[in-house]
Amino acid sequence: MNNQAKYILKAVFCTLFFLTLFGTTSAAAPPHVAVFSQQGFPYYGPLEQTSPRSIAADLEAAGLHADLLNVEALADPARFNSKLYAALVLPYGNTYPQRAFANLKAFHQVGGCFALSGVPFTHGVEVNSAGVWNDLGHKTETALFGPGGIGVGGFISGPHGRVQIAAGDPLGLNSLKLDWGRSDAIQILDIASLRSIDRIIPVLTAGGQADAALVTHPNGAFPISVDVWTMTSGSTDSDDLTRAYGAEQLMARGVVAALAQKGLLTSAQKTYALHQMDKQPRPVAYNNLTLPTPPHPYSTLQPKMTLPARHLYVSDVRKLDRDMQRLLFCLQGLVNRKQPRVFLISDDNDSFWLETMQKQGHLDAPIPVADPLTLLQTFRDVYKGVVVPDPNIYVSPEVAVDIAAADDLLLATPELAVKLNLPIKNDLRGRFRDDADALRFIRTDLLPRLNPYLGAVLAPQILGAQLDDIIAAKGICFWVTGPADSKKPGVDMLAETAELEALLAQMPLGAIVRGYPWAGDGSGLGERPGVALFSRFGKILTASDYVANYSVMSGFPLTHLAQKPQPPAPKLDPSKVYLSLVLSDGDNLSLWRGAARPLFTDPLHGTFPVGYGMGPSLIDVAPPMLEWYFSHMAPTDEFICDVSGAGYVYPSSWGKALKDQTGARRRFYHDWTQDYMARTDMKGLRVMEATEDDLAWVGVDTPQVAFQMPDYGYLGEDYAHLTYALPGGQPVFRAASFGPEARDLADQVRTRVGKSRPAFMNVFVSFWGADMSKLKKALDLLGPEYVAVTPSQLNTLYRESSRQKADK
């Protein structure tokens, strides 16, 4: 019997048993519940792993009838009304479907119940002609009572302190044994926004206030409506799957409690329903994990190839279709595994770097290959055939990449294999049930034959030029879908995430994850959830979804490279504001392939000081690129280590799933980050998603780092909390801006420095949209009271000012 049949039988049994609790009359049938579910609908507040389908399954297991309804159904009074449904679950947080608002209001006014998440009914969303959901902006009155409101209540900032289960435990949460975290950043129901006749039943509390609650709303001649507010996001010490599970349980159990409060369930029926929910599967919680320690195949964090041949086979693949290109990138990886001999041109950036490597003396004249497909014959001895992915399993191409790396195969469609007369050695069509099954195969069957120190999170649609290095180093390619991918074949985001966690638990500390966990709004894990997940398991993301020819570039040895000397800092003037303009996103190695070059050839380059965040692992993966940028530095330029050290991690999440989190922190910062910063002559460090406590322990673990410049943009602190020194003396310059527009930058700096003089400011500038003319204009707008300096000069001036104050 398959799992689906077992689930159906189980649901039928639960429903029949539930009917015996109700009695046998048709009037006593289990209540029907609607769960809002719409592909691509934006989450605002809750984690994107919060699954409408899982909530519906929990309700079905509890004996209720649950239907997934989209926007079209919710907006139709004939398909959604209080006669058909007793309650509606709204799992997307602050966002709601504007088109359905009038019908939702009518449902609520006649006694329909809501299970709410986030700050409900504050962000209406509409779909445009292109099928993209657009947030219409914040609007408070739609949640309130009155002519234009739906009548659920407003919100206020939440209290501080641990979240605890309320007296009486009306949702039976104690049985879950979850850590509900702290409410420091949570907004809660504003009791003052309710009517005097409304009643609050606390579910979770913090600081004496209801953090989650049942709210009964008498409706005059109509039955009461009972809403459940479930705004808490759970403990940040827990992984996202556990937090999403907690949110789902709050909403599903809240529905049961609301229906019981409304009189649609008896006490016995409520008890039974909650007991059934207790028995539902829950995600594995990874804590106190000890990671494996297999032998490391190279001495660096990033994979390194051997020294390339002086004469490379060079071919332009731009005129080939994507399937042919992908096949040749696989061939390139297999050829270059032993010694880099093939360089493929997929855009103008590749031509630039090929010419640059010749000018640098790394390469001699290439061997031109007019027809790229002739490389298949030239290097026929390095591959054994092809592997064919399954078009009915979305992540099947990732599995095919891994098989290609393990078994010396090329990735091809069946049609391409026939066209090129290549034998199909592994056909994945029909091999897997779904994405999760495919990811499980990677972990159980392929991981032992691949390089556990290298992963690659790459969406199927972008697999291409970045594959050469992954295949050459036998990396592990994978992808986990997001809510926008829900209709793609084989997709199950929660099951996929669980499989990914199991895979990460079997990879060593410091394993690199190439690629990027986001491929458009709602596609993939998302940047923040993805980085947090990798960080929890001690894995280092290296953003590199659009790179190429690393299997060639990484082969050139480079142990250390010095930055150009800077002039001395200006004389300290106590009436001035000293600022350092520092561009963002340099941890993204794709940026250095092409997007950053115009900054260094701009006529304004070198006419004023600028700092650039850079991922120091560029010294491993592409030494010729690092050489080019360092050689094009002006004395007024400085590179600092970009987020958040030797790679992209969140200090607040780093190693949380591990038994020895302290050791993992020290390994990443004291050992790897300091080493890579020394190799690239970087003095300053930018970390991201870090509290003041995080910055303090990072400072302890990085005694050789001169200063910190944290944050991805301004986080709302005043000047006293923007610029300060850690107990060990290491200065911290938190971001005071975002930019990149000139007037915005100037206004942000003036506002946030206040009247402090002298002052020292980290002027964060978003790389995306920035250019030298905007930076120059911002400085002109600020005027002579504001002095631009390099990051290291800012550090020197701040330390001098601190000494002078201490001497007084």
Model segments located where?
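Extracellular ligand-binding/catalytic regions of CAZymes and related secreted enzymes
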Residues: 29-37, 46, 53-61, 80, ...
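Catalytic beta-strand/loop cores that center a nucleophilic Ser/Cys/Thr
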Residues: 146-236
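Active-site beta->alpha N-cap acidic-glycine motif
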Residues: 548-630
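Bacterial N-terminal signal peptides
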Residues: 11-23
